[in-house]
Amino acid sequence: MFADMKSRKPSWLRAKLPSGVEYGAVRKLVDDNKLHTVCQSAQCPNMGECWSRGTATVMILGNICTRSCNFCAIQTGRPTELDIGEPARVAEAVATMRLKHCVITSVTRDELQDGGATVWAATIRAIRNRNPGTAIEVLTPDMRGRLDDLDTILDAKPDIYNHNIETVERLQKPVRVQATYDRSLKVLAHAGSRGFPTKSGLMLGLGEKKEEISAALQDLRNAGVTILTLGQYLQPTPKHLAVDRWVTPEEFADWKAFAQSIGFEFVESGPLVRSSYHADEQSAGITGVQELREGGSLASA
């Protein structure tokens, strides 16, 4: 399943090159505040487009992950100690970028007793205090399925809860070695049961079958997920899983139509789509987030 990267990418996978004043400003902001972004660490193909729009997805809890998923470019190993000043710097960066919608994610920190939940909560509250009109979307690890740690994060009241199942049930083990399909569905269902809008996503092109994709989407709907992202898997290095096939834009459009037909409220589906791609647009129709942007407040969850 591992191979070199000689296969030629199709034309529809050409991403925008980094450029412009906004791109430079975001890069300086990230560097000056000693922040990490999943855009850089995960080699996101949309970094040029998003940074040129003045947006970035901040990654907390360092940039070294305790897990070694076979699809992910983020560095793995022994993480550094927690940075107690990180929540305040993240909040200030959100203010500087004047974001109406921010996305925060993290590496997985399985060595921490609470999986980093306390830092997650502190970051959400710092952003809220500094930026009361900003919608906060969190993209978290599975917290080892510990719902008390997940509740620590949810008690800080993010506006959208995101956790990706990444692939279909059959391919979980080769793709996400230390995670499980059922555990991911459990954390999504728990967040949804507390009233949070929930979101998840899959990569296509890893060898999944059509019936497996439709089953995974139905499982997400059964777990209460309302926002969906579907994108093409891209092999980050020769040491990672090889691409099984290039999924066409037309097929992504078909999956979007199917997902909408089974009840997803918003679907972002395309070759270059990633979890936080156009996240502000994904949340635009969600009542609570819309009220927040218009100067109101979200109901307690």
Model-inferred region functions:
Residues D4-L13, E49-E86:
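Canonical Radical SAM [4Fe-4S] cluster-binding loop centered on the CxxxCxxC motif
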Residues V21, A25, C39, I60, ...:
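Generic alpha-helix structural propensity
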Residues A73-R89, T96-A189, K199, M203, ...:
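Core AdoMet radical
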Residues Q40, I60-L61, T105, L139, ...:
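A secondary-structure boundary/capping signal
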Residues S68, L112, L171, P238, ...:
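Glycine/Thr-rich phosphate-binding loops of Rossmann-like dinucleotide-binding domains
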Residues M1-T57, E92, R98, A122-T134, ...:
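Auxiliary Fe-S-binding modules of radical SAM enzymes
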Residues P45, T66, E169:
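Nucleotide phosphate-binding site architecture
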Residues C65, T108-E111, M143, G207, ...:
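Short, glycine/serine-rich, charged loops/turns that create anion-binding
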